Amino acid sequence: MKFPQKTPLFSISAWVICSLLTSGCAQYASVSERRPNFPASLAADGGGLAKRLKAALQKRKSQPAAGLSSLLLEARAASRELATNPANSTARDTYNFSVARIVDTLQQAQLAPWEAPLRIPSSDGELILTAKKDSRPGWNPALYKFVPADQFDVHGKYVHEHSIKPGIGAPIVAIGRDKNRSAAETFSLPHIYYGVTAVIRFRGPVAELAFEDPLATETISFEGRRQPLSADFTVPLAVMLQEAEPKKFELARLLHPEKYAETARISRLQPYDPNKTVVLVIHGLMDTPATWTPLINHLRSDETIRQNYQFWFYSYPSGYPFPYSAAILRRQLDAIGKKYPIRKPMVVIGHSMGGCISRLLITDPGTELWKKIFRRSPNQLALAGETRSILEESLIFDSRPEVGRVIFVAAPLRGSDLATHWLGRIGSSLISPPRLLFKVGQEALQLATLQADELRLNRVPNSIDNLAPNNRFVRAINTIPMSSRVPVHVIAGDRGLGGNKDKTKPVQSDGVVPYWSSHIPEAQSEKIVSSDHSAHQNPEAIHEITRILKLHRAESK
């Protein structure tokens, strides 16, 4: 008889974590291209308009110029009707639908009016299609593939709310043709997926195509009056999510942080606007910036938020100990501040471990944190140059002057017992320490004298270790107050299972972070929402964040 071989502990541990990761996880975003539906007002039209549009769509397959001609004439007729009757919804729908199909035809036929005017014969004489010149960096249409937003079917956990804005123009997804090679120096995304709105203005036989930014422009000049600019805020985010596949990086960046070191950076989600307040979002353990999609998608549907805020995110390998991730963030803030000066106090929103990082942005420890960790001052310790540099950067720092408000969402500021639970210990043991931090950790372990009840390790602490309530750093940082200059807000999840708000078991919790760990007595506000640990995606929490952002705008005037 053959006995089954014993499964190595590593394999069991990996299986446990992977099982927890994949169970019950819906797809973040699923996108597929489809034939666009006629707007309801056009579908209901039984006359010549719908027939002419259908004929134009059929014609453009084999005769792009003829199809463009028909679509331009329909767009021009609708534009003229809107000049005299701007409330005519059928004319608006006809115009927007025609412009979307014109952009799609240009792409399919590989025609580029931004390179040279297109002369197009029509039943009403020759039409000349040109493109508006745009000198802004990155706004050269030749850099992008343009797909009308109404040609996408969008589903998924993170994009179930479809945020659109009615108005003039065809919402378009601009997809970068090549990798963005200036991403690091411009703090932008490595691959561009951005929502623009196509507008065609007619002057006699000339039709001028322009791509407007709906995050920068609320209204446009159209046929002699200001008109709201149409927008689709959801489809570009969904396309980006599907192409980026963030889910495959969540576990990988936790277990192998050194491999993904270059992903520790701030990135802008839109062109920099010095007149808008920055909202910097910071994700948590085993997560990516994709986790903020439901929040950003909803916030962009609010005109007040669009007009006054711009969104940046800080991404990092979540296997790093969070004091080190905070040190990298401070470096990034220094760098981005030189290129894009932050003129208004920014709002930082941190979820889970991202909240712990956020806390370090508004703390002034001086050398106090160092002394609490090592029981000696910095000049009393003999440390190698690189080790000393990393430890000083992580433990001796000032609060950030550009931060004007912080929102903590499900943040384990005093740790989580899950980090000391058997599953947390298994997860911690699977994280491969970066070589540089391993060396630093070995030297630091020899110098730190632990108390009897403190977390003991024979290796460098990682992110999970840094979330243990009995971790020395966690204990030390909680003896140092946050800056009274910066108002803070707390949003905590509650699964509705009852429990105590103090450490008396059973405790009130979101399933990961207990209330006693996230509560801040001096917070300007505290909101408990009916949620598990993903409180930042909860509708109640999103509503509360919207309220706080509007409060920040009002108080910053």
What are these regions (language model features)?
Residues S432-K557:
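C-terminal subdomain of alpha/beta-hydrolase-fold enzymes, centered on the catalytic histidine
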Residues P271-P274, Y340, R400, M482:
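Short, flexible hinge/linker loops that cap or flank conserved catalytic cores
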Residues K2-A14:
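Bacterial N-terminal signal peptides that target proteins for export
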Residues T293-Y309:
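Short amphipathic alpha-helix adjacent to the substrate-entry channel of hydrolases
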Residues S32, A55, K59, A66, ...:
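Serine-dependent carboxylesterase/thioesterase catalytic core
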Residues C25-V279, T288-P294, Q310, A554-K557:
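Flexible, membrane-associating and regulatory peripheral segments of lipid-active enzymes
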Residues M286-D287, S318-G319, T367, P412-R414, ...:
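Short, solvent-exposed loop/turn segments at secondary-structure junctions
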